[in-house]
């Protein structure tokens, strides 16, 4: 009898140690990393998607900019913004693939893994300025001017 009681108590102790409770500690959402504008490059078909100094954003009083010479041949240029190593939180693009960008129209880019390429089709051959600035919720505003 004592032996049976001992086995029952031991079994209860072992099963209590291996069971999980219904309580779990919630995970705290980490804030999105801040966009490092000084490290961003304009990357697209016009520069073979490379991060070169000619396409690195420069600071001015209106934010950050890059001037690019584009040929108006009726074909869209795919592009996006990213640092030199395509860090997901530092790669900015559209909400959907091929999102169009128009001259002098502000759009907001998302900076996260899964952002998509943007498209710009110049109406005239010439130099275009890609101007970016910080926006809300880890977004970047973009305006292309001529």
Positions of PLM-derived features:
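Extended low-complexity, serine/threonine- and proline-enriched intrinsically disordered segments
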Residues: 38-42, 141-146
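Exposed beta-strand face motif in extracellular beta-rich ectodomains
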Residues: 75-77, 128
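Beta-strand-rich extracellular modules
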Residues: 82-84, 135
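Sec-dependent signal peptide recognition
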Residues: 2-8
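Short, exposed beta-strand-loop hairpins at the edges of beta-sheets
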Residues: 119-145
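Bacterial signal peptide processing site
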Residues: 18-21
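Aromatic-rich carbohydrate-binding modules that target alpha-glucans
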Residues: 32-74, 84-110
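C-terminal motif of bacterial Sec signal peptides marking the signal peptidase cleavage site
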Residues: 13-16
